[in-house]
């Protein structure tokens, strides 16, 4: 068995584990007090994380460069980031429902990379000259981690919008504080919804969304700055309005607006969630859309023909 076959096995195994884990979290939604299901779900995420990390490590060993030089590698790294953030949230914040957000998106990203990308795009290729730099590790890893955090935070906001759909609900209070504190007060005209435990879940989702985006935004900022420094080193210009640079700036502006409305204006609930939903679309355009067009300085190394 050669390294390519091992990589294929690891990719398929990680996808299968994520699929099984998603089913486990679905069962957990029915049997809410079953701790065994929760344990199996966490183990599924943990082993999936390990398998993807092993896959990327093998590619690193085989290619002699950090495995973030094409679309397949970046997608698998994004999948790893989703599972990594899941484990962090479960460990330090102890929010079990996060699996309903992280597992499906990690599985879909894994599936797209493993089953939909052409085989020639999955194989590791030599680095183009501009990518032969130590900036590759810092810039690309930070950008991918920021994408993962922003996507997860935006998905939580979308979940909040679904949960509060057709409900007259308003959140009041300060966004800053401990996520486990009862620091927000909720005003709702819908009495049945007020009696439902969903209001507490909505409260938690809104707060967690804010904090996750609060992690992704500084990472995105650092990623853009490091990319500008790398661009100056490689091409002699800090900023050239390349499509990827332009959409990264748009992404930064959208989430800056989100954080500004929450921190300065005191917005909570539906209005910032709508901004985050817009940000969710923009992130995917920045990450996948620009590369699918195959134009600009960032198109090489992702889609080769």
Swiss-Prot record:
Membrane-topology annotation of the record: Multi-pass membrane protein
Entry GO terms, CC: chloroplast thylakoid membrane; plasma membrane
UniProt entry keywords in alphabetical sequence: Chloroplast, Cytochrome c-type biogenesis, Membrane, Plastid, Thylakoid, Transmembrane, Transmembrane helix
Disulfide bonds: none
GO terms of biological process kind: cytochrome complex assembly
Pfam families hit by this protein: Cytochrom_C_asm
Membrane-spanning intervals of the chain: 11-31, 36-56, 75-95, 97-117, 142-162, 212-232, 239-259, 273-293
Localisation: Plastid, Chloroplast thylakoid membrane
Coarse class of the protein's main subcellular location: plastid
Any one GO MF annotation of this record: heme binding
Role noted for this protein: Required during biogenesis of c-type cytochromes (cytochrome c6 and cytochrome f) at the step of heme attachment.
Oligomer and partners: May interact with Ccs1.
Family note: Belongs to the CcmF/CycK/Ccl1/NrfE/CcsA family.
Name this protein carries in UniProt: Cytochrome c biogenesis protein CcsA
Organism: Mesostigma viride (Green alga)
